[in-house]
Swiss-Prot record:
Top-level taxonomic group: Eukaryota
Molecular-function annotations in GO: N4-(beta-N-acetylglucosaminyl)-L-asparaginase activity; peptidase activity
Keywords: Autocatalytic cleavage, Disulfide bond, Glycoprotein, Hydrolase, Lysosome, Protease, Signal
Protein name, entry field: N(4)-(beta-N-acetylglucosaminyl)-L-asparaginase
Sugar-bearing residue positions: N38, N308
Subunit structure: Heterotetramer of two alpha and two beta chains arranged as a dimer of alpha/beta heterodimers.
Disulfide bonds: C64-C69, C163-C179, C286-C306, C317-C345
Entry-linked Pfam families: Asparaginase_2
Gene this protein is translated from: AGA
Amino acid sequence: MARKSKLPLLLVPLLLCQALVRCSSPLPLVLNTWPFKNATEAAWRALASGGSALDAVESGCAMCETEQCGGSVGFGGSPDELGETTLDAMIMEGTTMDVGAVGDLRRIKNAIGVARKVLEHTTHTLLVGESATKFAESMGFVNEDLSTSASQALHSDWLARNCQPNYWRNVVPDPSKYCGPYKPLGILKQDIPIHKETEDNRGHDTIGMVVIHKTGRIAAGTSTNGIKFKIHGRVGDSPVPGAGAYADDTAGAAAATGEGDILMRFLPSYQAVEYMRGGEDPTIACQKVISRIQKYFPEFFGAVICANVTGSYGAACNKLSTFTQFSFMVYNSEKNQPTEEKVDCI
C-alpha cells in the first residue's frame, strides 16, 4: 500500500501564502493612543533607521513630550494644586520584562528618557519625586522649570475659582467651596458636605504606545503630566507596570489612557495582555477590560489599545455623553503613513 505523503505542519501556512500570493506580515507595528501623529511618525522613523522596539517607544513618547501633546504630555501643562507641573513616564521591554519608570518627576523635561535610564542603569522599576530628579541629573539630564505662562495662568484661574475642581474629600473646610489647607473631617462633623469630583474628561490624554519590531520583539511605554490641579505628590497609572502599559513578547502589549486613579486599580494593560494570551482578539481583550471597570465605575473616563504578537490590534473605550468615540494612531508595514482610526465606545 502506498504511503501517504505528510507535509511538515510549518510548511502548510507557507504554501497557503504562496497560493494566495499576498502574504505580507503587518509587522512592524506602531500603535498609540489619541491622534498624536508626529509621535507615531517618530517611532516609525526609529524603526526604519534600525532602532529597537524600545528605541521606537522612547522616540515616540519623547516627541509628544517636546510637542506637549494635547497639553497633557510634557512640560507646561496640568499644574498641580501648588502650580507645579510634574511628569510620569514608563517604558517596558517585552523580551526581558524589564521596566523603567518615573513618577512625580520634577524639573526634568524628558521623562521617558529618564525612565529608560532607570531601566538600563538600575535594578529598580520606579523612582519618584525629588529623588527621581536627582537621579536624572546624575544621568546628564538638565534641571529646568517645567512651568509656562499658560500653566501659570491655569493655576491662577483655578485659585480665583476657589480651587474648583479639586481631589479632596472628607476634609474641612468644605473642598467644594473653599481652597485649603485642609484637615481631616472629624467624626462629629459629618454634616459638612463631602466633595465630589467635578472635573470634565479633558486633560487625561496620556500618550500610551505599543511597538512590535519586525523580529517580534515588543515594547510599550507612556508619558503624561497627569491631571490638572492634582494634589501635590500624586502619581497616576502611567508609570505603573500593568496599569499604564504592559508588554510581553509571548502574548502582546497594551496601554491605557484616562482617569488614572481608577484605571490603576484594575491593571487594565496587564489584564488585556492576559486576555490575548488566552486567545482573545485584541479588540475583544480591550472591551473586556473596559467592561470589568464599568461594573464598579460606570462613569469613568478611559480607553485601552491592544496588539497581539501577530500585529493584530484593537481598542475600546467607556461611553459617556461627552465621549462616544476614541481616536488612536496606527502605522504598520501595510500602511504607507500614520493612520488615525476610531472606535465607538461601549
